[in-house]
């Protein structure tokens, strides 16, 4: 193989590896950006920023500690697949203050597996014009339908003591008014 071909082959291989390790998606209006990456130890991380680069959530770890420590999804993971998609629908609520609600987001689905035993987990990110949502998913399988989560390791490294809009909860009711306060007051 000629040196020129070797350099091109290496560049292509490295660019493919990099895209599997770090990925960015934008909200539909391009105002927000989600950055997903993996550490050298195989730990998934994310951060959220405005389009101009100003961070909202600093780099934060993702993961789940399982009852069986060998099955924990916090490090020793590798990306096996990523898929991007867009969803846009308008629906009409039965009651409420608005007649129509638009559900519009860009999605990044990252599938990971444990290097030690091959157990899979997926993280589904949905980036809206006004925020981010994500969840962990356990792809089904013959012997992969029962997990015991000991502790969630998800981090939210906020860049400051921002304003929060939240509703308190209790064991016997969810009928409370929304509270507007600083994160430190939640």
Region locations from a protein language model:
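N-terminal secretory signal peptides that target proteins for export/translocation
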Residues: 1-3
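Functionally constrained cores in energy, signaling, and assembly domains
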Residues: 5, 23
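Bacterial N-terminal signal peptides
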Residues: 8-17
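N-terminal accessory beta-strand-rich subdomains and adjacent acidic, glycine-rich linkers
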Residues: 24-186
């Amino acid at each position: 193989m000629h040196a020129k071909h070797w350099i091109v082959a290496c560049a292509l291989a490295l660019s493919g590896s990099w895209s599997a390790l770090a990925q960015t998606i934008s909200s539909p209006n391009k105002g927000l950006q989600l950055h997903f990456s993996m550490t050298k130890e195989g730990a998934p991380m994310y951060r959220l920023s405005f389009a101009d680069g100003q961070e909202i959530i600093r780099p934060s770890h993702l993961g789940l500690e399982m009852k069986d420590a060998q099955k924990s999804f916090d490090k020793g993971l590798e990306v096996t697949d990523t898929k991007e998609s867009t969803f846009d629908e308008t629906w009409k609520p039965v009651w409420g203050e608005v007649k129509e609600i638009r559900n519009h987001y860009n999605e990044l689905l990252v599938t990971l597996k444990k290097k030690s035993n091959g157990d899979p987990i997926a993280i589904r990110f949905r980036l809206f014009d006004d925020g981010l949502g994500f969840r962990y998913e356990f792809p089904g399988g013959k012997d992969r339908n029962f997990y015991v989560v000991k502790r969630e390791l998800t981090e939210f490294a906020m860049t400051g003591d921002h304003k929060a809009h939240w509703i308190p909860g209790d064991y016997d009711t969810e009928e409370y008014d929304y509270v507007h306060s600083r994160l430190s007051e939640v």
